[in-house]
Amino acid sequence: MSNNQILFERAQKTIPGGVNSPVRAFRSVGGTPRFVARAQGPYFWDADGKQYIDYIGSWGPMIVGHVHPEVLSAVQNVLADGFSFGAPTEAEIEIAEEICKLVPSIEQVRMVSSGTEATMSALRLARGFTGRSRIVKFEGCYHGHADSLLVKAGSGLLTFGNPTSAGVPADIAKHTTVLEYNNVAALEEAFGAFGDEIAAVIVEPVAGNMNLVRGTPEFLNALRALCTKHGAVLIFDEVMCGFRVALGGAQQHYGITADLTCLGKVIGGGMPAAAFGGRRDIMAHLAPLGGVYQAGTLSGNPIAVAAGLKTLQLIQAPGFYDALTAQTKRLADGLAAEARAAGVPFVADSIGAMFGLYFTERVPTSFAEVTKSDTERFNRFFHLMLDEGVYFAPSAYEAGFVSSTHDDAVIDATLAAARRAFAALAA
């Protein structure tokens, strides 16, 4: 029995399902989860000492690679000063200033500890600001595990085949209207029917939790125009795509401004940190200035802030995103080329440092199209690549991530492994 198997059996005795987040359990793809012993750059090593090229990167945060020396040094420099204070620090101001500089639509920002906290707080703020209750979200978009957002969500729920979580009261779910992603006609119809009841529309402008699905410019521009017309708050959930698709996130990529933005992943540099922010007149409704309450003991934690601030500084290096985008595109295009050569129906897409792999005939644009993926073939591909030492997301419904440490040699090794994997699939 491998060390991974021993650890998984042991974990299941004290941890539900043996994991602290469902997708890690390999339930979708089968087999034994890999328990990570250490990581460095684009690699991690499991409990059995096997090395893997890592295309998850902690589900997005590790954009400069694992254990970047400057991030490590930044964390080490603050450790001796204290782990948590429950009081403000200068470092909180510094990371807030950096975020506001990089995402111009964010005039003020509030730090929290997780993406779920960010989206949950942004929705409460939007409701408090507008005095309305209804929110609109989109099929397959995952915004964390708050009750009102676990309605036809993607990510782990899609992996387990459950569009809506048990334990969500109908009285809460009734305030959430779910529309098809990228469907402008459905959006216009909804706003025509009850636009003046909508407090907020929350959307992943680049969805990463039903695999990678891009929002179309037409769809996102329609969202912006309709929210403005009806006085609804437009919330971009950029927890995943923020600082991933461009330095200024999806808003820079599309040239569309949100009223509120949720951030996470990259802004913690691998530590637990997230944020929400936006227009000053909306943020002024937050306590202690306004009547919308939001708080957190570990919000703005000094260690997380140190890691996040250094990461945000590193990604501003000249040419950083050009190189990262090019490497990610090279990976996606290369995988698609290897599949074509083997005669395997497969397509790939990338935007910035995110990519999607699909066992379909074309790149999907909606939740419904994503669910047509050949999951059995994906599962075989996943395990073939895992055996080759390449770690993709253990689900056909998750995006992948590339870091600045995934150099040409790493991409070449991945494509060589994929050539063998696709050949095995075609046999």
Swiss-Prot record:
Main subcellular localisation = cytoplasm
Cofactors required: pyridoxal 5'-phosphate
Q: Which UniProt keywords apply?
A: Cytoplasm, Isomerase, Porphyrin biosynthesis, Pyridoxal phosphate
Q: Which GO terms describe its cellular component?
A: cytoplasm
Where in the sequence is N6-(pyridoxal phosphate)lysine found?
Answer: 265
List locations, semicolon-separated.
Cytoplasm
Which molecular function GO terms apply here? glutamate-1-semialdehyde 2,1-aminomutase activity; pyridoxal phosphate binding; transaminase activity
Look up the EC number in the record and give it. 5.4.3.8
Please give a single GO biological process term from the UniProt record.
protoporphyrinogen IX biosynthetic process
Q: Name the InterPro entries for this protein.
A: 4pyrrol_synth_GluAld_NH2Trfase (IPR004639), Aminotrans_3 (IPR005814), Aminotrans_3_PPA_site (IPR049704), PyrdxlP-dep_Trfase (IPR015424), PyrdxlP-dep_Trfase_major (IPR015421), PyrdxlP-dep_Trfase_small (IPR015422)
Classification via Pfam families: Aminotran_3
User: SUPFAM superfamilies, alphabetically?
Assistant: PLP-dependent transferases (SSF53383)
Q: Which reaction does it catalyse?
A: (S)-4-amino-5-oxopentanoate = 5-aminolevulinate
The record lists the membrane-crossing segments as none
Which domain of life, per UniProt?
A: Bacteria
Q: Pathway, according to UniProt?
A: Porphyrin-containing compound metabolism; protoporphyrin-IX biosynthesis; 5-aminolevulinate from L-glutamyl-tRNA(Glu): step 2/2
Q: What sort of enzyme, by top EC class, is this?
A: isomerase
Assigned protein family? Belongs to the class-III pyridoxal-phosphate-dependent aminotransferase family. HemL subfamily.
What is the annotated quaternary arrangement, including any partners?
Homodimer.
What is the recorded name of this protein? Glutamate-1-semialdehyde 2,1-aminomutase
